[in-house]
């Protein structure tokens, strides 16, 4: 039997790696469009600024073909290079298009009519056609300009610093819309605005050169449709991943925004590795996971064999991205997502709800994370020289913090006084919020996660949601027959000063603590945890 399992493991790995054998046939060369790219050999900032604005208008134009927009994008992304012609050789590596570099010496006056080099084969009719394309700006752009400020195109950029400020600001906005151009092109604008605000705060985008949202959308669609541009951007990203800390300003910005592009479209795979395998919790020993664990092992080897370009599979539109889809390992994915929702607040923004999400294994991950949050990794503990007492103390500390935030991994409630081990009852009969201690007499926090008590929690929460509360006798009396107390939080009345409101809150907290201590003294079975008994109400009412 063991030989069969070993053969199955080798078969699974080989199945993922067989596409990379040396005898794989080379695909046939397809028909490639001719893309004309305008370049300048001069470092004149005014000329380069005019070429940038010209390329930007070609991308925006209503009458421009896809090849026109692709050439304008390549020219625009090459403007920071001192030798544009040499830099464009990166684009010639792409099997998608043929590049025709056209050198220009300037523009006629303040117009967008290019002046080709004497060696160029560009005709006068083509020059006039490009000028007409640049002037055909869509009506959806305000003031017939891509920029929010209408006077940007009329500005003078005679100094190198002014041109670089304009160039870097425009290119950074193009890089920002590239981040999700393949995986989520219709994402809400708020995600783009957050990154825009980040780079404005860092001084990498000048607010004067902000593009209109419609202009950014057009640029994103143009990049999405032009594979040769995405190939070129991938080479740029690889050059930006320099091992040295000394880099020019442009590639430092490219390397920073490239972190949003890396592993795009592979969030499910890496989250499964991080939360499912990285935690190394005993639940992985389930027999149902054995086959998918072999699959994940094969996929990790498969990813390593793809080389440094594997990080940009979504940007490159690679079919190999489908190999890493979570549908290939649904149980491990569901289990990992359950863990992630408990231990990582960032998972709230991740849309993990898929048709292949298994609810049972998702809940298994949730319960495992709640129970194992105080677990200690034995190998790390051994490296740190932790004793058994240290492990117990660490687990107890984490358990106390978890209970103080609502119990069993729940998020803290809005009411700052609602953290007493989740003993929060939504509303009393009179509409005031209150705490019910009588329902928790039999609570034993040493066995906090027992199935019996979990059922008690569910019953308690269900009754609280339905507004029925518990037994009237318990609702009217505290623990040990103590008289009831109004636990409604004081509200700040209009015109009340800060000192008066603070005094009311202090008095309220003192009454709550006093009532809670009296309730503990009258408890018949001592059903509260040792930490609360030792510290009074301070452990549960942490103000």
UniProtKB/Swiss-Prot annotation:
The keyword Ribonucleoprotein applies. Residues 405-543 are annotated as: Ntail. Keywords: Capsid protein, Helical capsid protein, Host cytoplasm, Ribonucleoprotein, RNA-binding, Viral nucleoprotein, Virion. It is found in: Virion; Host cytoplasm. Pfam families: Paramyxo_ncap. Residues 1-404 are annotated as: Ncore. GO terms for cellular component: helical viral capsid; host cell cytoplasm; ribonucleoprotein complex; viral nucleocapsid. Residues 448-543 are annotated as: Disordered. RNA binds at residues 180, 195, 260, 350, 354. InterPro entries: Paramyx_ncap (IPR002021). One of its GO terms (molecular function) is RNA binding. Belongs to the paramyxoviruses nucleocapsid family. Forms the helical nucleocapsid (NC), protecting the genome from nucleases. The encapsidated genomic RNA serves as template for transcription and replication; encapsidation by N is coupled to RNA synthesis. Forms the encapsidation complex with the phosphoprotein protein P. Before encapsidation, the newly synthesized free N protein, so-called N0, is chaperoned by P. Ncore is globular and carries the regions required for self-assembly and RNA-binding. Ntail is an intrinsically disordered monomeric domain in the C-terminus. This is Nucleoprotein. It comes from Simian virus 41 (SV41).
């Amino acid at each position: 039997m063991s030989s069969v399992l070993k053969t199955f493991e080798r078969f699974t790995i080989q199945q993922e790696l067989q596409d990379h054998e040396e005898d794989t046939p080379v695909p046939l060369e397809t028909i490639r469009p001719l893309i004309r790219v305008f370049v300048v050999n001069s470092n004149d900032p005014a000329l380069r600024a005019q070429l940038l604005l010209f390329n930007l208008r070609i991308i925006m134009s209503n009458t421009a073909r896809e090849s026109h927009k692709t050439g304008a994008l390549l020219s625009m992304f090459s403007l920071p290079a001192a030798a544009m012609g040499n830099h464009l050789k990166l684009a010639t590596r792409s099997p998608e298009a043929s590049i025709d570099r056209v050198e220009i010496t300037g523009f006629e006056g303040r117009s967008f009519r290019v002046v080709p080099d004497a060696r160029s084969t560009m005709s006068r009719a083509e020059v006039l056609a490009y000028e007409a394309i640049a002037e055909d700006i869509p009506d959806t752009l305000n003031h017939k300009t891509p920029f929010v400020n209408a006077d940007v195109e009329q500005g003078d950029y005679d100094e190198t610093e002014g041109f670089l400020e304009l160039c870097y600001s425009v290119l950074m906005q193009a890089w920002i819309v590239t981040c999700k151009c393949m995986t989520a092109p219709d994402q809400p604008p708020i995600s783009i605005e957050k990154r825009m605000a980040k780079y404005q705060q860092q001084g990498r985008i000048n607010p004067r050169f902000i593009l209109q949202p419609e202009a950014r959308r057009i640029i994103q669609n143009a990049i999405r449709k032009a594979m040769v541009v995405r190939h070129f951007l991938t080479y740029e990203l690889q050059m930006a991943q320099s091992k040295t800390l000394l880099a020019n300003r442009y590639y430092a910005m490219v390397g920073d925004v490239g972190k949003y592009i890396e592993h795009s479209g592979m969030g499910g795979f890496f989250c499964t590795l991080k939360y499912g395998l990285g935690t190394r919790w005993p639940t992985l020993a389930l027999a149902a996971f054995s086959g998918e664990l072999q699959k994940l092992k094969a996929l990790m080897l498969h990813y390593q064999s793809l080389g440094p370009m594997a990080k940009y599979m979504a940007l490159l539109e690679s079919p190999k991205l489908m190999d890493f889809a979570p549908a290939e390992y649904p149980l491990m994915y569901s289990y990992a997502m359950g863990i992630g929702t408990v231990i990582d607040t960032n998972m709230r923004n991740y849309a993990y709800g898929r048709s292949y999400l298994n609810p049972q294994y998702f809940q298994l991950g949730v319960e495992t994370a709640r129970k194992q949050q105080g677990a200690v990794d034995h190998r790390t503990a051994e490296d740190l020289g932790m004793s058994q007492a240290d492990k117990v103390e660490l687990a107890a500390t984490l358990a106390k913090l978890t209970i103080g935030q609502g119990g069993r991994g729940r998020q803290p409630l809005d009411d700052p006084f609602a953290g007493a081990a989740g003993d929060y009852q939504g509303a009393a009969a009179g509409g005031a919020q209150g705490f019910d201690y009588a329902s928790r007499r039999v609570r034993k926090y040493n066995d906090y996660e027992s199935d019996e008590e979990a059922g008690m929690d569910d019953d308690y929460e269900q009754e609280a949601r339905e507004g029925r509360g518990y037994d009237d006798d318990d609702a009217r009396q505290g623990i040990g027959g103590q008289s009831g107390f109004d636990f409604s939080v004081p509200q700040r009345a209009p015109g009340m000063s800060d000192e008066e409101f603070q005094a009311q809150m202090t008095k309220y907290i003192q009454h709550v603590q006093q009532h809670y201590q009296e309730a503990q003294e009258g408890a018949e079975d001592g059903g509260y945890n040792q930490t609360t008994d030792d510290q009074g109400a301070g452990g549960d009412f942490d103000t």
